Regions:
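Extended, low-complexity, turn-rich repeat/linker tracts enriched in Gly/Pro/Ser/Thr and Asp/Glu
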Residues: 92-100, 141-144
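Noncatalytic modules at the cell exterior or secretory-pathway interfaces
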Residues: 85-89, 125-143
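Transition segment at domain starts
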Residues: 22-78
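Positively charged n-region of N-terminal signal peptides that target proteins for export
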Residues: 1-4
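C-terminal motif of bacterial Sec signal peptides marking the signal peptidase cleavage site
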Residues: 12-15
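Short, surface-exposed beta-strand/strand-loop-strand elements in extracellular ectodomains
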Residues: 95-112, 150-151
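Bacterial signal peptide processing site
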Residues: 17-20
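Edge beta-strands of jelly-roll/beta-sandwich modules across compartments, strongly enriched
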Residues: 138-154
């Protein structure tokens, strides 16, 4: 009887852990379980290393997020488009400090830019040519978090 109770307790605990891991994406996610066959992502990268001891981040196939405390410097992800596409983005930035949020193409041309000193959530679409892009967050004494997700339009 004790073994059965222990097995039930272990199964219940495993279910709780699974729920926690699955909930890690973001409760405000707009583009859950999308298929982006023409967009490949990599990252997170840093221009000069992580200058924030409390920095944490995670990434998925169509999203990235980070939390930070007194961050200064540039973090970025890479997106590679195998063909020209219209891409929908959902950005949710919670902020104290300054962040320049931008998307640049392989020629270092800025295709999207937001200079932020306050929190901002927005949806936007970009017509992007085939090629490589960097999504950058240039921060100065910033505390907060960012969440970005994307999907290709059909």
């Amino acid at each position: 009887m004790k073994k059965i109770a222990l097995i039930i307790a272990m199964i219940s605990l495993q279910s709780c852990i699974t729920v926690k891991v699955n909930a890690d994406v973001d409760s405000n996610s707009f583009y859950r379980k999308v298929d982006n066959p023409n967009i490949k992502s990599q990252g997170t990268f840093f221009d000069k290393g992580v200058g924030d001891s409390k920095w944490s981040n995670s990434n998925g196939d169509n999203w990235t997020k980070a939390k930070f405390d007194d961050a200064s410097g540039t973090s970025y992800i890479k997106l590679k488009l195998s063909k020209s596409l219209t891409v929908s983005f959902h950005s949710d930035i919670h902020l104290k400090g300054d962040i320049n949020f931008e998307i640049v193409d392989q020629n270092n041309e800025v295709v999207f830019n937001r200079q932020l000193t306050n929190s901002k959530e927005e949806n936007f679409k970009l017509d992007l040519a085939k090629g490589d892009y960097q999504v950058r967050w240039n921060s100065t004494n910033a505390t907060g978090s960012y969440f970005l997700e994307w999907k290709e339009e059909k």
